[in-house]
Amino acid sequence: MALDTDKIIEELKGASILELNDLVKAIEDEFDVTAAAPVAAAGAADAGAAKSEFDVELTEAGQEKVKVIKAVRDITGLGLKDSKDLVDGAPKNVKEGVSEDEANDIKAKLEEVGATVTLK
């Protein structure tokens, strides 16, 4: 038994919406499948995707503010005044859009001198 796709399509073009709906339900029942769109599955996959860029936020300078200012200056390349302003204005982003490894390195350096850091 050979299927003539063109004939089937022509028959479907002449069917009403109700007839097509019944056909879809019958096919789902007969072959134990669903005609649901895979959009929901794709959305769930995107939600679970690993984050590739991080922002390093200085949440609090801690007790050793001078050491934190020096560390911020080394990390960012900012001048002394800009580094001090950043530390004084905490919570502020020290670096934005960096890789996970770089973000963790920066976090470790800042926590080593007593700062509280959050990765976003």
Curated annotation (Swiss-Prot):
One of its GO terms (cellular component) is cytosolic large ribosomal subunit. Keywords: Ribonucleoprotein, Ribosomal protein. InterPro entries: Ribosomal_bL12, Ribosomal_bL12_C, Ribosomal_bL12_C/ClpS-like, Ribosomal_bL12_oligo, Ribosomal_bL12_oligo_N_sf. It comes from the Bacteria. GO terms for biological process: translation. The keyword Ribonucleoprotein applies. GO terms for molecular function: mRNA binding; structural constituent of ribosome. Coiled coil: none annotated. HAMAP family: Ribosomal_bL12 (MF_00368). Belongs to the bacterial ribosomal protein bL12 family. Homodimer. Part of the ribosomal stalk of the 50S ribosomal subunit. Forms a multimeric L10(L12)X complex, where L10 forms an elongated spine to which 2 to 4 L12 dimers bind in a sequential fashion. Binds GTP-bound translation factors. Forms part of the ribosomal stalk which helps the ribosome interact with GTP-bound translation factors. Is thus essential for accurate translation. NCBIfam families: L12. This is Large ribosomal subunit protein bL12. It comes from Lactobacillus helveticus (strain DPC 4571).
